[in-house]
Curated annotation (Swiss-Prot):
One of its GO terms (cellular component) is extracellular region. The keyword Transport applies. GO terms for molecular function: retinal binding. Keywords: Extracellular matrix, Secreted, Transport, Vitamin A. This is Retinol-binding protein 3. The gene is RBP3. The keyword Transport applies. Transmembrane segments: none annotated. IRBP shuttles 11-cis and all trans retinoids between the retinol isomerase in the pigment epithelium and the visual pigments in the photoreceptor cells of the retina.
Amino acid sequence: FQPSLVLDMAQVLLDNYTFPENLM
């Protein structure tokens, strides 16, 4: 289990929720 991997995934999720237009 790598905490750094969780932080990276959390950052990606935050980016996706902050900029949902990029996914459309």
